[in-house]
Amino acid sequence: GAGVVVLMSASMAIEMGVPVYGVVAMSGTATDKEGRSVPAPGKGVLTSARERASGGSPHLQVLDVEYRRRQLRKRQTQIDEWAREERALLSTDSTQTSESLEFINTEAARQHRDALDSWGTEFWKQNPHISPLRGSLSVWNLTVDDIGVASFHGTSTKANDPNESRILNLQLSHLNRTRGNVIPAVCQKHLTGHPKGPASMWMLNGVLQTLRSGVIPGNKNADNIDQELKECEHVVFPSRALRTPGVKAGLLKSFGFGQVGAECLVVHADCLLGVLSEQQLSEYRGKLEKRERRAYRYWHNTLTGVHPFVQVKTSPPYASSSSESTYLDPHFRLPKMY
């Protein structure tokens, strides 16, 4: 089998008015060594918590979103000032002025994008004091204490369960998660079994449902937790569902065969929608409602035989006679369908 998830940038999702179920704040894979045991899990995913354990990492100034916002505004002001100075130096030659003005505007836009990356999603990169996990959380003004659920690979094997629990516990300890703020572990393979292709897709869907509902499902078969797992002070294995005021972020783990592991940090969609202005949010909601109505009609037309579910296109969205000029035109864009 297989599972499909539609991923796109936040700006594109807002512009198109598509439903946002969650934000992929971080993802990664890791292989730690050569292993002869097929089912033995590796520990390479520990690298997402790699940072110098100085005890002061959570207090770094750059982790403060207000500090980063101030630096971003300062950089944006510098870019705008540079663009104004360059425009003032343009000659009166209309041809040269037009081309130079286009370059200045394009370069200013590029610098603005770089500034957003530098002080936004990528501020923590190449900093040995900030781990990928901590940095990715801080992008959304969250900390390691805000991770409210962990979706385990959870194969219930003698090798996987203790190893996976210890790895998560070690990550949280290294990142100074507050003691007593335990993270519920969800091992949904007790219900779904172990699929092949869509395993992580099902787990991701479960995390998204937890983020949207605030309900952390229990592990129905967890009626006798192994004493060995008690050493993991940051992890708890609930046997019944927990209704919470809300879960801000969830951590999904996948431990594959041959020491291959993967990890994905998913943040609540409200963290994205919360940064929009009132006008932007209103426009997004309008587009979303329109898209939902169209999707509803399309689906029912499929069920009633009006048209097939997949309508395969047999011709390009441009005239065949102009294909060469289209390929060579960097400004060519298809008409918006939303």
Protein language model annotation of sequence segments:
Residues 1, 15, 106-109, 167-202:
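Conserved catalytic cysteine-centered active-site region
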Residues 1-18, 194-219, 230-239, 264-267:
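Active-site-proximal alpha-helical scaffold in enzymes
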